[in-house]
């Protein structure tokens, strides 16, 4: 079949290259992975006696995800099995945790918190049982109403999947370059 094969001038290796969304996750080494994929394509073409194609890929999430941080203002805090910190956002600005269980982390962003921590869940403002922004995270035990939580690595899908669910506004974007 190789003698009658169409010679592909270019092969797109696609996208979806992984990034670390939470502490303890490893980011993919994109140089190693893309080299491995390109070597596999080129060795297969050599074995079939075909010329090497131009190889492209789509690094969107790998570039954009770490570039976004979503800020939430803490509203109420309930101390139950684990502490629930209710924020002023939620599934309307990041549906991924509710839709398919995506996990994130959060950090106190507006001040230095106490050294003592509590296991917390960051919940959204919508009256939905699945409106959870962060399933479990260690936050300062002195977290209080008005504090700002930063949820990193939201650049890839947060804004593009956001909606006006329950007539909420889509959060503003602040673009920062270097310093």
Language model: regions and residue ranges:
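Active-site loop/helix belt of alpha/beta enzymes
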Residues: 1-78, 166
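Charged (often Lys/Glu-rich) extended helix/loop segments that serve as interaction or gating elements
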Residues: 50-179
């Amino acid at each position: 079949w190789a003698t009658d094969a169409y010679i592909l001038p270019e092969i797109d290796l696609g996208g979806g290259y992984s990034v670390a969304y939470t502490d303890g996750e490893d980011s993919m080494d994109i140089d190693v992975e893309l080299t491995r994929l390109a070597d596999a394509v080129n060795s297969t073409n050599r074995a079939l006696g075909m010329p090497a194609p131009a190889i492209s890929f789509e690094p969107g999430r790998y570039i954009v995800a770490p570039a976004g941080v979503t800020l939430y203002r803490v509203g109420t805090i309930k101390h139950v099995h684990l502490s629930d910190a209710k924020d002023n956002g939620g599934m309307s600005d990041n549906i991924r945790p509710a839709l398919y269980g995506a996990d994130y982390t959060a950090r106190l962003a507006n001040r230095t918190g106490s050294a003592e921590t509590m296991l917390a869940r960051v919940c959204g403002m919508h009256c939905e049982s699945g409106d959870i922004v962060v399933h479990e995270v260690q936050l300062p035990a002195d977290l209080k109403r008005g504090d700002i939580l930063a949820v990193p690595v939201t650049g890839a899908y947060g804004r593009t999947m956001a909606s006006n669910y329950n007539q909420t506004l889509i959060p503003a974007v602040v673009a920062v370059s270097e310093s």
